[in-house]
């Protein structure tokens, strides 16, 4: 199993404030999004996170979940992100689970929730990956 905590964030993840938090034994991988002002898509009086920021979270968290389930190099080949409500510019919990990791393809589901007492679900997504090595 890959030690996900030892992997450095990509430059894009670092720019978005996306960091690895933990991997659970049940296959859930958790990341934290601390969005900078550059990740916003709206202005005052009601700023919100840009949809591209949330889609990047689906891609990255899905990759972490797939890599944990079956290490060996994966590349996203398909991505879907459903935006359920405006995402406030606050920290968010990004949780992913690998649904399937085969010899050549893998699929992960992702939930993005506000990281606060309400834990409102703001987006869900699914990412598919193709193995790039071996």
List the predicted regions and their residue ranges.
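A generic structural signal for short beta-strands and their flanking turns/coil linkers
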Residues: 14-16, 27-29, 73-79, 90, ...
């Amino acid at each position: 199993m890959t030690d996900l905590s030892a992997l450095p964030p990509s430059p894009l993840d670092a720019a978005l404030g996306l960091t690895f938090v933990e991997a659970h034994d049940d296959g859930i991988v958790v990341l934290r999004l601390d969005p900078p002002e550059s990740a916003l898509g709206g202005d005052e009086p009601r700023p919100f996170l840009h949809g591209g920021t949330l889609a990047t979270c689906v891609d990255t968290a899905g990759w972490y979940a797939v890599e944990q389930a079956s290490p060996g190099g994966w590349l996203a080949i398909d991505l879907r992100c459903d935006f359920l409500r405006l995402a406030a510019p606050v920290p968010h919990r990004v949780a992913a689970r690998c649904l399937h990791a085969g010899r050549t393809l893998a699929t992960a589901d992702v939930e993005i929730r506000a990281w606060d007492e309400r834990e409102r679900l703001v987006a869900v997504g699914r990412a598919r990956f193709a193995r790039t090595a071996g």
